[in-house]
Amino acid sequence: MYAVRFATAASYPTRFLVAGADSARRSQLAFTVWVMEAQGRTVLMDAGFYRQKFIDRWNPVGFSKPSDAVTALGFKPEDVTDIVISHIHWDHLDGADLFPRARIWLQRDEYEHYTNDSGAVLDRAIDLDDAKMLAGLRRAGRVRLIPGDSSEIIPGITVFTGGKHTFASEFATVRANLAGGRQGTIVLSSDNAYLYENLEQHRPITQSLDTLSNLRAQARMMRLASDPRLIVPGHDVAVFERFPKPGNGVAHIE
C-alpha cells in the first residue's frame, strides 16, 4: 500500500485542522492519493484534484495531476479499476474523472446528501461542478453506493463511517503485506484525522459535524489497526518522513 503525494500546501492554519490549536501555528498539508492492489484490481483511496480553479486558489507546491503522480508506481490512469471516495470535498473527488475505467465507491448517504443543491450549498468545500460530475458518472453506471458502516467493498478493503468530517465521510481498513512478510491492517483515515497530532493527542478535527463522533472514530481506528503507526492521517507531510521509502513523494506503508 502506497501513499502518493501530488501537491503540498506550504502554510495552512493549524487551528482549522486540530481543535484548540494555537491560532499562530501553521502546518504544511500533503495532498495525497493512496494506491493499493487487491484481488487483481488497482484501487485508489481518494482521487485528488486537478482543475485550474483549485490550483489558482491554493497555489500548491510541486503539483502534478493525480493521474500523472501514480505513474511513479508504474500505473497508467486506465489501469485504475476502483476509487474509494472518502468524502466529496473538492480535493478528494475532483480527480475522479481522470481515471476513465474506474468504478467510484462512496457512501450512499454522502452521495444523496451532497448531489442535491440543498446539501451541497451547506458546505463550502463541496464544489458544485464536482457534484455534477459525480452524478454524471453515476448515470454512466460507474458509481457504486455503499449502504453504510463496516462494508467490505473489495476483498481486503472495508469502509467505516462515523468520523463526521462530512455528512457520511468514511475511512478504510486495508489488509496488506507489511515489512518482514507479515500481514496486517492499515487504516486510511482520510480527513477524519488530518494530522498525526489528531490521533496521537486524541484531538478532534476542527472541521467536523460531530466532535464526539469524530473522537469515537479515532478510537475505533486505534482498535482496527494492527499497530498505531499504521493509522495514516489524511494530510500530514510527516507520513513521508515516517515511511521514507521509496521516496520522491511516494511512501510505502508497511
Please state what every model-predicted region is.
Residues 3-5, 33-37, 43, 52, ...:
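Core dinuclear metal-dependent hydrolase active-site scaffold
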Residues 60-106:
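Active-site metal-binding motif and surrounding structural segment of the metallo-beta-lactamase
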Residues 1-75, 79-82, 108-161, 180-191, 211-233:
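Metallo-beta-lactamase
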